């Protein structure tokens, strides 16, 4: 993003409905632009690595701070995944975002972080898919057909069509609780999007030029090495299920090197790993031929939460909620 945010009102609380309504009015091309511009300007953000707090049974919290001095914005997001208990009516992912004036420390907004996370995660994956997939791709394999994947593949196809690219695209979908129907319904008006319904991961991944996974909990690799065709691009949105690819893929790209240093095979794939920002700014090459197998680890960076939250804040019309912080020095 460019320029300083216009802070008006006090703690504006755009909840889930408000955030969702604003996002629905924003074209996918603009959302992709937010991701792209933030990555290009990454050096202008203060971005500590996210704090990952592990709990029992695979539950966790991520704490993600970020400051953008040029925009006068500081942000922290607290988000976690927690198994749903009997009788609960909520998403397994819950999160909140706090926005502050960076030069005063005044809280300006409390926002729904779960929807923003879903949105920016899917859009980031779509951005990477456009950047690193071989230009002559035809077949896309999709695993984990929930909200993040819906955002991702919708934006990916929309960006192609917006550029006048009407090529035939085949989407290979894993059958799971009829989730595949939602993806198919997205493209009912596009005669050039075709579908193959699959019962196994081998069917989805084998022969696909682009493989995207959005499954949030995986305990083993989806398939063995031979199912990844030459020239394929693999984007594990939640970073799991493709550890075998770490050992033999030709190139690895990441949104933030520091956040993947703890991966089991990092030392093995580090020599072929490049930050996406360096590719966008011309400091390093991206895909250089149609035979490279490419792996993209977007571990999720707070600059995208900040940019999406700030842009949504600027568009919010919900009533202000007064926030009465201390205005004078006091003694206890």
Please provide the spans of the model-predicted regions.
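N-terminal ligand-binding/catalytic initiation module
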Residues: 1-118, 126, 303-306, 313-314, ...
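Adenosine-phosphate binding glycine-rich loop
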Residues: 19-22, 245-332
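Glycine-rich adenosine-cofactor-binding loop
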Residues: 125, 136-159, 174-179
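Short helix-loop-beta connector
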Residues: 132-139, 229-230
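Active-site catalytic pocket residues across diverse enzymes, especially alpha/beta-hydrolases
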Residues: 156-160, 226-227, 316
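NAD(P)-binding Rossmann-fold cofactor-contacting core
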Residues: 159-187
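Rossmann-like adenosine-cofactor binding region
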Residues: 192-267
């Amino acid at each position: 993003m460019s320029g300083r945010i216009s802070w008006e009102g006090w703690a504006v609380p755009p909840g889930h409905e408000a955030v969702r309504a604003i996002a629905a009015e924003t074209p996918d091309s603009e959302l992709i632009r937010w991701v792209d511009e933030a990555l290009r300007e990454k050096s202008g953000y203060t971005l500590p690595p996210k704090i990952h707090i592990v709990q029992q049974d695979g539950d966790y919290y991520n704490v993600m701070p970020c400051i953008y001095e040029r925009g006068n914005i500081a942000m922290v997001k607290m988000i976690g995944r927690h198994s749903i208990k009997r009788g609960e009516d909520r998403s397994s992912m819950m999160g909140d975002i706090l926005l502050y004036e960076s030069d005063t420390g005044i809280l300006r907004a409390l926002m729904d972080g779960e929807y923003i996370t879903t949105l920016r995660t899917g859009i980031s994956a779509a951005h990477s898919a456009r950047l690193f997939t071989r230009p002559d791709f035809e077949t896309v394999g999709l695993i984990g057909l929930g909200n993040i994947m819906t955002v991702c593949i919708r934006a990916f196809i929309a960006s192609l069509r917006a550029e006048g690219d009407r090529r035939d695209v085949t989407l290979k979908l894993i059958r799971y609780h009829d989730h595949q129907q939602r993806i198919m319904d997205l493209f009912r008006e596009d005669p050039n999007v075709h579908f193959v319904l699959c019962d196994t991961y081998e069917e989805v991944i084998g022969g696909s030029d682009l493989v995207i996974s959005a499954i949030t909990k995986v305990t083993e690799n989806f398939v063995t090495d031979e199912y990844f065709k030459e020239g394929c691009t693999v984007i594990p949105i939640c970073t799991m299920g493709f550890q075998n690819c770490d050992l033999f893929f030709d190139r690895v790209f990441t949104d933030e090197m520091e956040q993947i240093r703890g991966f089991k095979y990092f030392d093995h794939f580090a020599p072929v790993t490049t930050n996406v920002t360096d590719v966008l700014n011309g400091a390093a090459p991206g895909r250089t031929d149609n035979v490279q197998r490419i792996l993209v680890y977007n571990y999720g960076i707070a600059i995208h939460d900040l940019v999406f939250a700030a842009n949504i804040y600027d568009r919010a019309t919900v009533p202000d909620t007064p926030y009465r912080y201390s205005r004078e020095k006091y003694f206890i």
